[in-house]
Design a protein with these regions (language model features):
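Short, exposed beta-strand/loop patches in secreted or surface proteins that constitute
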Residues: 44-49, 68-69, 116-122, 171-176, ...
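Positively charged n-region of N-terminal signal peptides that target proteins for export
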Residues: 1-5
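An acidic-aromatic
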Residues: 48-110, 121-161, 217-226
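N-terminal cleavable signal peptides for secretion/export
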Residues: 19-55, 61-63, 83-84, 89, ...
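Short, cysteine-centered beta-strand-loop-beta hairpins and adjacent loop/turn segments enriched
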Residues: 38-39, 138-147, 192-196
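Non-transmembrane domains of secretory- and envelope-associated proteins
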Residues: 21-23, 38, 82, 125-126, ...
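Bacterial N-terminal signal peptides
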Residues: 7-16
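A short, amphipathic edge element
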Residues: 107-119, 162-171
Length: 271
């Protein structure tokens, strides 16, 4: 996915904004994360979203593991309850990303620091008001230009044309109720220069301001279930007092996952 909103359930499919004290808090909630593959195998985990803090609990190598992405304290944590141990990585302010906060403007360069953007026009696309932008990026001595039509209401790209000729489109298909929640169903289509295309469907929850389900081609889907909107207790995002800090070399027997100890923790998707 070339766009800033590429979907990963161990990431996010909407452009995230850097967290700072000046930004509003995200909606707090808890939910079950369910992922299914074409062979019908399902994987489940539990997510807790606090005030600029996210906790994910899951099973790995027969052990419970907990990932915490704590933007308030600029750190990422990995907890292993069976060993009463944890690892910690400091996250610089400029690296912090909170996918639970909606984008605050339509300039696509606000998400890609090394790019330069120029506003070309205000238009209507797929029945929605958009602004058209040109983005210029210098990469390996080459100047790459792309076009982006950004939705004025949601600040997300409805259409993107990339230097290699590929095109990404996002269209609102209608309102639907999913697991008792009011959502909007969006269809995303990625077309390649050779004519091949991939289509996915996303259900966006206006209250949470994230997408709570995505269906991918081939039988993949991932979603949030049993969503409960409520403030989350602070202890979910702290290290228990009896836990010992260890280094990755000391952690055994399971190797740490590639989640919160990198730049991002696993998050649900956002439009």
């Amino acid at each position: 996915m070339k766009g800033a909103r590429g979907f990963l359930f161990a990431g996010c499919f909407c452009a995230a904004t850097g967290a700072s004290a000046a930004e509003p808090s995200n909606v707090q909630f808890s939910a079950q994360v369910v992922k299914s593959t074409p062979d019908k195998k399902t994987h489940q985990s539990q997510i807790y979203v606090g005030d600029n803090q996210v906790r994910l609990e899951y099973e790995r190598d027969s052990q419970t593991q907990v990932e915490i992405y704590d933007m308030k304290n600029q750190r990422a944590l990995l907890l292993v309850p069976q060993q009463a141990s944890y690892m910690e990585r400091k996250v610089p302010q400029e690296e912090q990303i909170n996918p639970m906060l909606p984008p605050t403007d339509s300039n696509p360069c606000s998400r890609i620091r090394e790019a330069q953007c120029k506003l070309l026009a205000s238009e209507s696309l797929y029945g929605r008001e958009v602004t058209k932008w040109e983005m210029v990026v210098n990469q390996e001595g080459k100047t790459l230009r792309s076009l982006h039509w950004m939705d004025e209401e949601r600040h997300m790209p409805l259409r993107e044309q990339w230097p290699d000729g590929s095109v990404s489109e996002l269209r609102l298909m209608g309102d639907e109720t999913l697991h008792g929640r009011a959502t909007e169903r969006w269809e995303m289509k990625n077309s390649q220069p050779d004519g091949e295309s991939i289509t996915s469907t996303q259900w966006y929850d206006p209250e949470l301001q994230i997408a709570i389900r995505e269906e991918l081609s081939g039988g993949y889907f991932r979603e949030l279930r049993d969503i409960r909107v409520a403030p989350q207790p602070d202890h979910l995002f702290t290290v228990p007092p009896n836990y010992q800090r260890v280094t990755p070399e000391q952690q055994k027997p399971a190797a740490p996952p590639t989640g919160a100890l990198q730049q991002r923790a696993p998050y649900p998707a956002r439009q």
